[in-house]
Amino acid sequence: MLLAPGDVIKRSSEELKQRQIQINLIDWIESESGKEDKAEPKEESKAEESKDGQGTQSESSQKKEGSKEAKDADVDRRIHTAVGSGSSAKGPGVRANENVDRGDGKVGGGGGNADAGVGTIGANGGRWVVLTEEIARAIESKYGTKIDVYRDKVPAQIIEVERSLQKELGISREGVAEQTERLRDLRRKEKSGAHAKAAERGRRKQGKKPHGDVQKEGTEEEKTSEEQASVGIAIEGVMSQKKLLSMIGGVERKMAPIGARESAVMLVSNSIKDVVRATAYFTAPTGDPHWKEVAREASKKKNILAYTSTGGDVKTEFLHLIDHL
């Protein structure tokens, strides 16, 4: 059993139902004065069990339930639009539908096989690369396209994954920081290389002008040096999924729902009463006023595993944890 903040459970309710995982949600309602009303427990059974006991609900409670579900669905839609979370936005290593195209050129575009980096050829004939292993794994997991990591070779065409796409791919803060550091190193090297070439040209101008074949040889060497400098490293910032796919090929994978039989998690809850039987808890920034107390009690239990959000998309991290416990 997994404990989690109530708002995280709410936002993930549809995916939890797909996995046939039970929900025990202690809900909270804020009055017009801003004070919290009495907490209301709410339980949702597995899909096959949810049919029992429905006849005893009053008409007013059914209306309340329906309006709440519509509100939750609307929240999910807004989140999906903003950061691309949901069942199709898993982190690296999640289970994927075996029938998804692996990048053989029939669906995702770009010939060749996935291991060869299908669809990653840049405008100048070189292949697009990324700056970190985490970004490469996230792209392969989400789009089925294998992409290489930059290995300090010139020339190179590098994809810089910008903020909105970082969220879409579920890149951690550490992964973002690693990309930033590598970009700084590249620009520093590029700047120092440009200064060195300028100094070399200055020394040549100050020296004696060569004659005959020597002059011809010197001109050719300078021309070759300028050509190498013009090739160098190209860095392309990418903000949207659409642009990324046009550069690397592939299509977004549709993840198969993971059932309760495939996950060790059978129940998720934000109730303090469930601390005694919980095996793990997931904590993240939350608006659930009861969660702080629940997490404090859970942290006192030596047999409960603790998991914390890394700062990425919380819903994606929560579902990823459930699928791998």
UniProtKB/Swiss-Prot annotation:
Keyword Kinase assigned: no
S-S bridge residues: none
Superkingdom of origin: Viruses
Pfam families from the UniProt entry: Orbi_VP6 (PF01516)
Keywords assigned by UniProt, alphabetized: Virion
Residue spans of biased composition, Basic and acidic residues class: 32-52, 61-79, 176-201, 210-226
Main location: virion
Bias-annotated ranges (Gly residues): 106-123
Family: Belongs to the orbivirus VP6 family.
Role according to the record: Surrounds and interacts with the genomic dsRNA. Possesses ss- and dsRNA-binding capacity. Its hydrophilic nature and capability to bind ss- and dsRNA suggest that it interacts with BTV genomic RNA.
Name the record gives this protein: Protein VP6-B
Organism annotation: Bluetongue virus 10 (isolate USA) (BTV 10)
